[in-house]
Amino acid sequence: MEDVQSHAPQIPLNIDRVGVRELRLPLLVRDRTRGTQQTVASVDLGVDLPSEFKGTHMSRFVEALEQWNDEISYQSVRRLLQDIRQRLEARRAYARFCFPYFISKAAPASGSPALVSYQCRLTGELDDAGQHFILEVDVPVMTVCPCSKAISNEGAHSQRAMVRMRLRMKAFSWLEDFIDIAEASGSSAVYTLLKREDEKYVTEHAFAHPTFVEDVVRNVAQRLSEHGQVEWFSVEVESMESIHNHNAFARIERHISDRS
């Protein structure tokens, strides 16, 4: 059969990345408590395409992913990227796994357990120069405004904020490490299940630890700098302001050797 993809294109331009998005598959992830956990991932795969080819071979991405079927790790994703490069005769290969990660968390007063989900992403790129991996973890926290607390006779405004961490690692680290860092950096962690005594505890704890979005991002950055396995990070905290018609955000990006 005719291979139309191999024809010359009308406009001979290199394409930086072409491929497939939102392939869904079961995924096995390492779990600090249980060893592993089963989740579901949405996967993007891509390669570069030289100017002399009209199109890439989309089916080969699916074939590579079907053959892969592995526990996610830097090593296993590297094998997938190598296979994609070979199958598509590409210089660069790209893969991105997006998945929810679940932790059973006990409510702070009653101890009632419930699963909390955290959105995670692992992105890998491979070319002749080497491999590059970025781990991303999104963690919701609660913040209480220090200014509102200081100037109000009763109460202060509070809201949920999202801590988004992008990390380049020296070696494997548990997802729980970074979830713990984020949850310790706001006014309070958030929970799926809270009884009345838990709501009382969370409210009082949060109001005893008011934090600006600037405080949260600095807290996270300091803890990431001290982690030991992180060589680069970008952390952004976005506060879904409860009394404003806008959100607030703060961001820090650092190589660990850069302390300023």
Curated annotation (Swiss-Prot):
It catalyses: GTP + H2O = 7,8-dihydroneopterin 3'-triphosphate + formate + H(+). It holds the Pfam family GCHY-1. The keyword Transmembrane does not apply. Pathway: Cofactor biosynthesis; 7,8-dihydroneopterin triphosphate biosynthesis; 7,8-dihydroneopterin triphosphate from GTP: step 1/1. The record marks C145 as: May be catalytically important. Keywords: Hydrolase. One of its GO terms (molecular function) is GTP cyclohydrolase I activity. It is an enzyme of class 3 (hydrolase). Its EC number is 3.5.4.16. It comes from the Bacteria. GO terms for biological process: tetrahydrofolate biosynthetic process. Belongs to the GTP cyclohydrolase IV family. NCBIfam families: PRK13674.1-1. HAMAP family: GTP_cyclohydrol_B. Converts GTP to 7,8-dihydroneopterin triphosphate. This is GTP cyclohydrolase FolE2. It comes from Desulfovibrio desulfuricans (strain ATCC 27774 / DSM 6949 / MB). The lineage of its organism: Bacteria, Pseudomonadati, Thermodesulfobacteriota, Desulfovibrionia, Desulfovibrionales.
